[in-house]
């Protein structure tokens, strides 16, 4: 079903939602859940809202303003909103390492809505100086099990057991998602990241499942495997060898941070999360930015580009193309870039530069 009716452009992002599961328009407009999150979330989502208003994009926002520091019961407000609207744009909720009493709201949201696939796009951007150029890889991460299952307990004082859950059903689901993504986006290979040399049952199940799905259902694509520690080294040394990486939960988080460093930082990485019924778009590297909150210096590029992925998901491709081009043009010219990529512009100045560029397109 996912292969039907959706055309892909070469090396561009193609949605994987079935058309019948997309939200309905009311009065010619979509309603989208907006979750600013913590840290710089409000600043960068404000950039998107301003750009969308300037472009008269037919989207209304339902804002759910809660913090990751709040009780997990509050995540229900976001869940209920997303169930109504089916699509969301989200900042990152902060989960302190020493937090006790409740788990991550980010994880809770993904589990409750079964948003099982995280997609992060790592592509070199002209105008951003980095050690390596022409990087173009995708990390597809299973979002709902693995080390993030949240099953921990102290069996006796001083002894903690953390359970890693891996299932064939969810491994098959993320494998098919990755292969479908590769086909729709004219990618050539899918590489399973694992640690099956040590975790022979859990990661062995994941690796073998990806291999079987690829060999039996997607013979036109190359299927590869790599151990996660080697993948980390290869990503730093020779990232051009990678096309689409499919990973269990934890490995995708680690490799995603490596990928963001390769292309210039977390402020440049767009991302999306998909389930069967719902889609939530957020920066791909999931950095909160608490240290620069309220300073008007955050790079909104990742959030802006994530919003263009959302527009394509909704079939609003012309708006997405305009905003993407304007954003890339501003970065390429280098006159109004933020300090994380060598400039001195503020968040609002970068946003205004994108709007000015849009007026000239």
UniProtKB/Swiss-Prot annotation:
Keyword Cell inner membrane: no
Binding of Mg(2+), residues: 229
GO molecular function (one): magnesium ion binding
Enzyme class: oxidoreductase
SMART domains reported for this sequence: Iso_dh
GO biological process terms held by the UniProt record: isocitrate metabolic process; tricarboxylic acid cycle
Top-level taxon of origin: Eukaryota
Interval spanned by the transit peptide: 1-12
Assembly and interaction partners: Octamer of two non-identical subunits IDH1 and IDH2.
Family per record: Belongs to the isocitrate and isopropylmalate dehydrogenases family.
NCBIfam families xrefs: mito_nad_idh
Protein name per its UniProtKB record: Isocitrate dehydrogenase [NAD] subunit 1, mitochondrial
The species this protein was found in: Kluyveromyces lactis (strain ATCC 8585 / CBS 2359 / DSM 70799 / NBRC 1267 / NRRL Y-1140 / WM37)
């Amino acid at each position: 079903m996912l292969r039907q009716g959706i055309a892909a452009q070469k090396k561009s992002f193609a949605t994987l939602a079935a058309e019948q599961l997309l939200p309905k328009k009311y009065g010619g407009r979509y309603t989208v859940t907006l979750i600013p999150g913590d840290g710089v979330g409000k600043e960068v989502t404000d950039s998107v809202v301003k750009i969308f208003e300037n472009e008269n994009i037919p989207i209304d926002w339902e804002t759910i303003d809660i913090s990751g520091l709040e009780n997990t019961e509050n995540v229900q407000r976001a869940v209920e909103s997303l169930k109504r609207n089916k699509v969301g744009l989200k900042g990152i909720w902060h989960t302190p390492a020493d937090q006790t009493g409740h788990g991550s709201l980010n994880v809770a949201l993904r589990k409750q809505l079964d948003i099982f696939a995280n997609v992060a796009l790592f592509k070199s951007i002209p105008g951003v100086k980095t050690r390596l150029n022409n990087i173009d890889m995708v990390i597809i991460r299973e979002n709902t099990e693995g080390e993030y299952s949240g099953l921990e307990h102290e069996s006796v004082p001083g002894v903690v057991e953390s359970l890693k859950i891996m299932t064939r059903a969810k491994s098959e689901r993320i494998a098919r998602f990755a292969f479908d993504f590769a086909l729709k986006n004219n990618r050539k290979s899918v590489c399973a990241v694992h640690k099956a040399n040590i975790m022979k049952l859990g990661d062995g199940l994941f690796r073998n499942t990806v291999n079987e799905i690829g060999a039996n259902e997607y013979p036109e694509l190359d299927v590869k495997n790599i151990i996660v520690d080697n993948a980390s080294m290869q990503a730093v040394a020779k990232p051009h060898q990678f096309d689409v990486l499919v990973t269990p939960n934890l490995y995708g988080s680690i490799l995603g941070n490596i990928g963001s460093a390769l292309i210039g930082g977390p402020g440049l990485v767009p991302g999306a999360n998909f389930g069967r019924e719902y889609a939530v778009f957020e920066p791909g590297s999931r950095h909160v930015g608490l240290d620069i909150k309220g300073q008007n210096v955050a790079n909104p590029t990742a959030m802006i580009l994530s919003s263009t992925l959302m527009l394509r998901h909704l079939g609003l491709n012309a708006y997405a193309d305009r905003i993407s081009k304007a954003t890339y043009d501003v970065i390429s010219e280098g006159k109004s870039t933020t300090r994380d990529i060598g400039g001195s512009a503020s968040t609002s100045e970068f946003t205004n530069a994108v709007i000015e560029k849009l007026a000239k397109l």
